[in-house]
A protein has these predicted regions:
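Short acidic-aromatic active-site loops that bind/stabilize oxyanions
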Residues: 155-158, 316, 320-336, 546
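Flexible beta->alpha loop and helix N-cap segments adjacent to enzyme active/binding sites
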Residues: 7-28, 32-35, 54, 77, ...
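An acidic intrinsically disordered interaction segment
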Residues: 130-137, 188-192, 206, 292-302, ...
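Short glycine-rich phosphate-binding loop at a beta-alpha junction
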Residues: 56-67, 155, 352-362, 452
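A structural motif corresponding to the C-terminal end of an alpha-helix
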Residues: 139-154, 563
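Conserved active-site "lid/cap" helical segment
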Residues: 12-13, 18-145, 243-329, 341-342
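Extreme N-terminal starter segment of soluble prokaryotic enzymes
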Residues: 1-4
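Phosphate/ATP-binding catalytic cores across multiple sugar-kinase/actin-like superfamilies
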Residues: 329-353
Length: 611
């Protein structure tokens, strides 16, 4: 059976299962070249499938990750001919509005500068009394059709947090595990977190812990003037290292973030988050009931008035010491809360779990918090899917159908299979390059030159893991400023990540585990030897690399170590500010031409500027 997984919403994504195994997954932004894109046009799905010698006509089932508890009550409102509300719902992520009861011929509606809605792909649904098919809280079936294709597909709609849970558990090596999902819900009625247990092919949610840290972090990011939380939350994490944690936050974080604090606002998360931010910054007054009600009803005028009244930081103010200190408090509260909540999960599951933890959801892109979870809770092992944000839910919904519904035996995945699950592109039209010489590339790196590195299939998730990377030497601190200002064109305070030979990682960093997907920030043991690869607090978001994982890049780092004595390179995503990571060879060539870098490597060829 061939299963196509789809996620519509910010970080829209596609995933493919063939012969009982996840073989491919990708964020749509890589194809559309629009950051955080939410559109799922048919042409991009076809383009993705073509990379795996598959067509839409070959597909047997389509799965969707969504908020099933929101959709279920609407199932009996429309007749089978007009019952497209559920599919319209998948096209939006920024409001609770019923968009239309006809999708055919509808155009995209621009929500923001980076988000679109109402994909044209879905034409009609066939829904004879769907309510009778809704037998669980986590998924339901309907038949779906795609415009222009004379075929009816089996469709499975899987709860958003269940999709997160499935993405991490079913790709782990664990027979049983506790699962923690956490993100920022766009809908005030929806859960922002979940506690699950996984055993064999089964996943079961046993508690909704009501944690809202993702929403809190996103709101803080926007009101500190950094930008929309869905895009810029990582910048807040970088900025926090320059701040000082206040005694107020240190003394009160547990009380502020306890579930009883949330419940006293009658589960109106926006009021709670306003209150929590006020405790920290004093700049975010509690919004009046009338105004808040208007916001929840999506009244744009009231929303705009509220934004002005709250007086958020300007973008210029976002790097003031006051903003840095607030960012430090936000990060501290997030880290301590996640450790506390994860330990609660351990206590609630220790009677039947052997110490395994799986996590997923955008909140767990917080690499600083992940290190604290890894080292300060009683769990022995921790697994994360590389695409742990919403882009991973396309794969999660497909895996849920495969293992939970079809009861197909679980598969083992290598690190490389999970890291590099995107499309492999044809590069035969690039005929003018020189044969790749890793010794030459290592020499250039050792002389503080910057390399565009493009190799094989694209990465799964938001991190550059060695197939779409800028590579540079970590030896000189000036490299950090050069790459931020002249290559990446981004904020000066953003750090760069090191990639290190796995067997040498403990010589350079305080860690006793591998982090192949660059999802942990760890302390550095030798920060003065690699100043360009550590942050202001001497931490680093490390990627560990084995020869089995990526032999070509591993060999390059070995050669660099022979010349420099350092088994580490800077590894940052092959893009510039505001753009997705490059996808195709042509994308890489275009970026090389407009970037202040010295060498371009595409698979087994290289190009040297001004050679």
């Amino acid at each position: 059976m061939i299963i196509l997984g789809l996620h519509m919403g910010h970080d829209a994504a596609v995933a493919l299962i063939k012969e009982g195994k996840l073989v491919g997954t990708s964020s749509i932004e890589r194809f559309t070249r629009r950051k955080k894109d939410s559109v799922l046009d048919l042409e991009y799905i076809r383009l993705f499938l073509k990379g795996y010698n598959t067509t839409l006509e070959d597909v047997n089932c389509i799965t969707f990750s969504t908020w099933t508890k929101q959709l279920a009550p609407w199932m009996d409102i429309y007749s089978p001919t007009d019952a497209v509300y559920p599919l319209a719902k998948f096209g939006t992520w920024a409001s609770n509005t019923v968009i239309t009861n006809h999708l055919e011929g509808s155009d995209r509606v621009e929500l923001t500068e980076y988000g679109y809605t109402l994909p044209d792909m879905i034409h009609r649904t066939s829904m004879p009394y769907i309510a009778s098919d809704i037998n669980t809280d986590n998924s339901f079936h309907i038949n779906v059709r795609i415009k222009g294709i004379d075929k009816t597909y089996k469709g499975l709609f899987v709860d958003h947090h269940m999709s997160h849970a499935a993405s991490t558990f079913y790709t782990s090596d664990f027979e049983e595990a506790a699962i923690f999902t956490a993100d920022a819900s766009m809908h005030h009625t929806e859960a922002c977190s979940g506690f699950f247990v996984g055993m064999g092919n089964q996943i079961q949610q046993f508690r909704n812990p009501e944690y809202m840290l993702g929403n809190f972090y996103d709101v803080a990011t926007e009101h500190l003037g950094i930008g929309p939380g869905v895009i810029k939350a990582g910048s807040l994490m970088g900025l926090a290292a320059y701040g000082r944690i206040s005694k107020k936050a240190y003394d009160n974080w547990k009380e502020w973030t306890a579930p009883q604090s949330i419940r006293k606002f009658d589960k109106e998360e926006h009021r709670y988050i306003d209150w929590l931010f006020t405790q920290i910054s004093g700049r975010f007054p509690i919004v009046g009931e009338k105004i808040r009600a208007s916001i929840l009803n999506n009244d744009p005028e009231s929303d705009q008035f509220t934004r002005e009244w709250q007086e958020p930081f300007t973008n210029k103010e976002s790097t003031s010491q006051e903003a840095m200190d607030i960012a430090a408090d936000i990060q501290f509260i997030t880290e301590r809360s996640l450790v506390e909540y994860t330990q609660q999960l351990f206590e609630e599951t220790k009677s039947f779990n052997s110490g395994n933890l799986c996590v997923a959801g955008g909140t767990f892109l917080n690499c600083n918090a992940n290190y604290k979870i890894q080292t300060e809770t009683d769990f022995d092992k921790m697994h994360m899917f590389p695409a742990c944000g919403d882009d991973g839910t396309a794969a999660g919904s497909a895996l849920y159908f495969l293992h939970k519904h079809l009861r197909h035996p679980r598969q083992k995945y290598t690190t490389a299979e999970l890291a590099y699950s995107g499309v492999i592109w044809y590069d035969g039209h690039l005929t003018d390059g020189e044969p790749l010489d890793l010794d030459v590339v290592a020499d250039y790196l050792n002389n503080d030159k910057i390399v565009c590195w493009y190799d094989g299939a694209s990465e799964n998730g938001p991190r550059a893991l060695g197939h779409r990377s800028f590579l540079a030497s970590p030896k000189n601190n000036s490299m950090k400023d050069k790459m931020n200002a002249r290559v990446k064109f981004r904020e000066w305070y953003r750090p760069f990540a090191p990639i290190v030979l796995a067997e040498r990682a403990q010589d350079w960093f305080v860690m006793d585990f591998e982090t192949p997907y660059m999802l942990h920030t760890v302390p550095s043991k030798k920060p003065f030897d690699i100043p360009a690869a550590v942050h202001i607090d001497n931490s680093a978001r490390v990627q560990t690399l084995t020869k089995e994982h990526n032999e070509k890049l591993y060999t390059l780092i070995e050669k660099f170590e022979e010349k420099s004595g350092i088994p580490i390179l800077i590894n940052t995503s092959l893009n510039v500010k505001g753009e997705p990571i490059v996808e195709s060879p042509d994308d890489a060539v275009n970026l090389f031409k407009r970037s202040d870098v010295d060498i371009l490597v595409i698979n087994n060829k290289m190009w040297i500027k001004n050679a």
